[in-house]
Amino acid sequence: MLFPLWTSLLVRSYAWMVLLQRTGIVNQVLGDLGLIAAPLPLVYNELGVVIGMTHVLLPFAVLPIYAGMRQVDPALLRAGHFFRVFLPLTAPGVAAGALLVFVLAMGYFVIPALLGGRGAITIAMLIERQITMLLNWGFGSALSVLLIASVLLVLGLATWLAGVRLPEVGGRSRPVATGGQVEDADEKPLDGTRWQGGARLEQPVAAPMLRRRPGRARRRWLRCAAGPAWLGIAAGAVYVFLLAPIALVVAMSFSSSQYLRFPPPGLSLQWFRAYFGSAEWIDATLLSLEIAVVTMIAGTVLGTLGAIGLVRVRHWSTRALYGVLLSPMIAPQIITATACYALFVKLRLVGSVVAIAAAHTVLATPFVIVTVSSALAQVDERLEWAARGLGMGPLRAFVSITAPLIMPAIASGAVFAFITSFDEVVIALFLTGTAHPTLPRKMWDAVAMQLDPTLAAVSTIMVAMSVLVLLIGQASRVWFDRYHTAARSDAV
């Protein structure tokens, strides 16, 4: 379900362009089935934008919804009505997922620009056009302020009117009052004797629903028997929707045809040879790798230090500072790109590795903060106090005790930072030129001019690199876990 999050946004956009074009697979299938007489206009309009953005943002909705469902006792689903019991308990997660998707969609640039074109112009596209093409900084800045104000207004209204907030991250538990005591809402799942928010019930929620008449019990049994089948079909459809476009692009990268065609008439490596034989593609790839490594190092260091300060410093302003540090994750990326472009134009650094890496670090650092702070909040600080009581200094105690415990989270944050930089295209459009583009910028220019099959090979390589980085990150986590397990065994 989350694999598309690790796949390049340009790869997914390119996949939908191939699928939805007039000679694409969707129109071919519909025509072969006799459902349409002429190709449907599925791309370069609002429909194409909706399909592409749904594909991209669906995993962001799944995360908070899944987290909310995990807190509900499965016995409630078996014994109670879905709409009366399960849905009300998971409603906060559903609302948070919807709010997150809405906020992210407000400032999206890549999908509308590629799949919408002139048929679906968004405010993010207007900002990019005013600043990079028309050089109208005043109007472009005004649109940027209007966009960020709209995002803040939506967040404020959702919190004030409905109590809906974006998913909380950072690993901090939310206390819940029950019966005059404070319990940790993250420690105990909702069960049959507890309602969300901590209110105790006189009897389990499931109890009255178990005492049913035989006729109603039989109908209930039939619905339960049919439920898993429909759920399986729905889940399968979602997986196909998320993974099929990527799989089709990978398949077409091995095609022997001279143009995009599915199914491929034969297998060939010609498009991979074209990629590796092109100095422009190789230079763009090496430049992206260089920037991604610099971003990973800088983002990991800054994000880890920020997480330590947020978790360990007890002050009333910590929560507000946490929101400020995470703002690049929520703010429309076109706003960040515009601000970075305005800064580096004055510093005369546009086009340099330093400028691009610095801008990417702004985007990558919040991911490291989220990952490391979640792990650091679970570490018992008394372990460091004990070490300091035995004569260790504060720095040595942290490095010897806490740092090894959060090292897997730091490694995961580094992976996030690397992939965030390697896949980034919006800032690259502002800070790089056509002479020395990054790989995403090179792909953007190629997609804008023509759907060259070489792009399918490049997309496959980017997917493979993302999978490789994920495997390296997972292997490092396993190694750290085994290392510390062995160290504890030796100590005992």
Predicted regions, residues:
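Compact recognition or signaling/catalytic modules
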Residues: G391-G393, P408, T420, T438
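Membrane-water interface segments at the C-terminal ends of transmembrane alpha-helices
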Residues: M1-R70, V85-F109, L114-G116, G140-T159, ...
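Short, conserved glycine- and acidic-residue-centered signature motifs
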Residues: G116, A120, P265, V354, ...
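A detector for short, charged/polar N-terminal pre-domain segments
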Residues: W221-G227
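Short hydrophobic, aromatic-rich alpha-helical segments embedded in or entering the lipid bilayer
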Residues: N27-Q28, G119-Q130, P263-G277, T434-A448
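C-terminal transmembrane helix and the adjacent membrane-cytosol boundary/short C-terminal tail
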Residues: L63-L77, R84, S141-R220, S317, ...
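Conserved adenine-binding aromatic site and its adjacent loop/helix in ATP-hydrolyzing domains
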Residues: M125, R129, M252, L287, ...
